């Protein structure tokens, strides 16, 4: 699987030597942009989960479609967060020259992973509870639609 990701990175022209990170200022800039991208990835994942939940149709009779929505909601959250972490680990970490800076960035990458995971699940749960309570997105919690 790792060879496939490296092949994709080569195809889209991402090189390990692009923009080497050698100074503390460059590292702080990279960390700040990583935090911003983590928030953006979280927002995009919530939007994709909303779209996917609206694509799954209601079922007649004993409606169990909320289970499909819940499974996709969890899959989208895990794929978005782990994908973001793997991308940073394969693309940004090799650009950092100093080993100490690499450890500092790895810690930032781990915190951003938790930000995406916790932010995705917490914000989407709040949206389900308060804004989309009777919609398909809110049915992920197991609530039935009004009949």
What are these regions (language model features)?
Residues 1-50:
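N-terminal signal-anchor transmembrane alpha-helix
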Residues 121-147:
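Cytosolic juxtamembrane helix at the C-terminal end of the final transmembrane segment
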């Amino acid at each position: 699987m790792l060879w496939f990701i490296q092949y994709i990175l080569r195809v889209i022209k991402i090189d390990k030597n692009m923009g080497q990170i050698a100074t503390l200022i460059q590292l702080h800039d990279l960390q700040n942009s990583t935090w911003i991208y983590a928030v953006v990835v979280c927002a995009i994942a919530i939007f994709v989960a909303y779209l996917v939940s609206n694509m799954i149709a209601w079922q007649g009779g004993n409606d169990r479609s909320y289970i499909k929505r819940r499974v996709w909601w969890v899959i989208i959250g895990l794929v978005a967060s782990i994908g973001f972490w793997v991308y940073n680990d394969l693309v940004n970490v090799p650009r950092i020259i100093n080993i100490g800076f690499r450890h500092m960035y790895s810690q930032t990458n781990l915190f951003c992973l938790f930000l995406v995971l916790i932010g995705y699940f917490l914000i989407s749960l709040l949206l389900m509870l308060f804004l989309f309570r009777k919609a398909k997105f809110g049915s992920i919690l197991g609530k039935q639609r009004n009949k």
